[in-house]
A protein has these predicted regions:
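The feature captures the beta-strand-to-loop junction immediately N-terminal to the Walker
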Residues: 39-41
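Conserved ABC ATPase signature
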Residues: 140-144, 148
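Catalytic Walker B motif of ABC-type/P-loop ATPase nucleotide-binding domains
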Residues: 165-168
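Helix-to-loop junction immediately C-terminal to a conserved catalytic motif
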Residues: 54
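ABC ATPase NBD coupling module
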Residues: 71-87, 117, 232-235
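Conserved catalytic motifs of ABC-family nucleotide-binding domains
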Residues: 161
């Protein structure tokens, strides 16, 4: 047993239906207080893994434990308590467009606590200050840029001082400056709060830069490699090398599994 384990994924298999398995016998341990980059090609199950950890889905097989407690979507009270300790930055922000920046960040505080509004105000301003956007508190979401929206979502994710922060493609669609700012915030917030962070990303450079360790999932939803960034960079595993080097040819095929083109066009008798 790993005493430093905060999240344990034990032989988890999951598919949205019987026709396709997304995650296949996945076992991973995410240590307390560390940043782990979860990488792999599109469709390999990275986001699905975060959703399973957050209790949004239930695994077909295997178990997930959060700080020693089983994650089970059927346990509504337990799930509510788990989400009180969890912050998630979704790929597309998931901000409420009809609310101000301030009210977006205040939302989890109003939902999960009984704090008076005067205290909520102070907490929200501190969180916005941490991401450099205290001055934007009264703006509408329609008035902010994509990079600012990502930082607002981050401020909301840390509003409850969560023990676990999960980031789903936090660098997607950002310019180089915004990407650097976001990566720096993720690393600094983790170090300052002692939280455990899971970062799903296609960006090898940023993932290796901020991650204490990294996990690589294959196109078949299996764990190909797990270790420090240096260990993955030194790996000779064909799928690891193809992903890190961005090579077009390798174990990961360009075409989604299908019948032959000749069969689909009716050319085969």
């Amino acid at each position: 047993m790993n005493d430093n384990a905060f999240i344990t994924v034990d032989r988890v298999t999951f598919g949205y239906d019987a026709s396709r398995t997304i995650l296949n016998d996945v076992s991973l341990v995410f240590p307390r207080g560390k940043v782990t980059a979860i990488m792999g090609g599109s469709g390999c199950g990275k986001t699905t893994l975060l959703r399973l950890i957050g209790g949004m889905y239930r695994a077909n097989q295997g178990t997930i434990t959060f700080d020693g407690r089983l994650v089970d979507p059927r346990d509504k009270a337990g799930l509510f308590a788990l989400r009180r300790r969890l912050g998630m930055l979704f790929q597309f922000g998931a901000l409420f467009t009809d609310l101000t920046v301030f009210d977006n960040v205040a939302f989890p505080l109003r939902e999960h606590t009984n704090l008076p509004e005067v205290m909520i105000r102070d907490v929200v301003l501190m969180k916005l200050n941490a991401v450099g956007l205290r001055g934007a508190a009264q703006l509408r979401i329609s008035q902010v840029s994509g990079g600012m929206a990502r930082r607002i979502a981050l401020a909301r994710a840390i509003a409850l001082d969560p023990d676990l922060l999960m980031y789903d493609e936090p660098f997607a669609g950002l310019d180089p400056i915004s990407m650097g700012v976001t990566a720096n915030l993720i690393r600094k917030l983790n170090d300052a709060t002692g939280a455990t962070s899971l970062v799903v990303s296609h960006d090898v450079q940023e993932g290796f830069l901020i991650g204490d360790s990294a996990s690589l999932l294959s196109s078949q939803g299996r764990v190909v490699a797990h270790g420090t960034p240096a260990e993955l960079q030194a790996s000779e595993h064909p799928e690891v090398r193809q992903f890190i080097d961005g090579a077009p040819d390798g174990p990961v095929r360009f075409h989604y599994p299908s019948r032959s083109l000749e069969e689909d066009l009716g050319l085969v008798q």
